[in-house]
């Protein structure tokens, strides 16, 4: 399923169709949040069903917001800078996602660390895409 999201994201060039890319990154972020909330509830059971639902919502919507900020910021940065295939656009988008996480947790430290780590991971992802690295390798039989 994640592979399908990445393929849909890569169908259009960077800096175009920002609404579509934001939708895809929001969905991918929400999926990651849903998976992480399932692990959280499995390994640390909630005291009540209401607490479990609240935890799922908190994880899912936070991750979806991070994905939305990444998608919008990356696309707008590519349009403003007029350099659609630059890894710096992805660093800026990842940094915006990290700042969103910091705002959600009310922590400057989380925002700073999230900016650096998410920005670096996103820039490396873009560099790998430009150089032909395989994120989902096909098995060689």
Swiss-Prot record:
Keywords: Acetylation, Electron transport, Membrane, Mitochondrion, Mitochondrion inner membrane, Respiratory chain, Transmembrane, Transmembrane helix, Transport. The modification N-acetylalanine is found at residue 2. This is NADH dehydrogenase [ubiquinone] 1 alpha subcomplex subunit 11. GO terms for biological process: mitochondrial electron transport, NADH to ubiquinone. The chain crosses the membrane at residues 21-43, 58-80. GO terms for cellular component: mitochondrial inner membrane; mitochondrion; respiratory chain complex I. PANTHER family: NADH DEHYDROGENASE [UBIQUINONE] 1 ALPHA SUBCOMPLEX SUBUNIT 11, NADH-UBIQUINONE OXIDOREDUCTASE SUBUNIT. It comes from the Eukaryota. The keyword Transferase does not apply. It comes from Rattus norvegicus (Rat). Its main location: mitochondrion. Belongs to the complex I NDUFA11 subunit family. It is a multi-pass membrane protein. It is found in: Mitochondrion inner membrane. Accessory subunit of the mitochondrial membrane respiratory chain NADH dehydrogenase (Complex I), that is believed not to be involved in catalysis. Complex I functions in the transfer of electrons from NADH to the respiratory chain. The immediate electron acceptor for the enzyme is believed to be ubiquinone. It holds the Pfam family Tim17. The gene is Ndufa11. Complex I is composed of 45 different subunits.
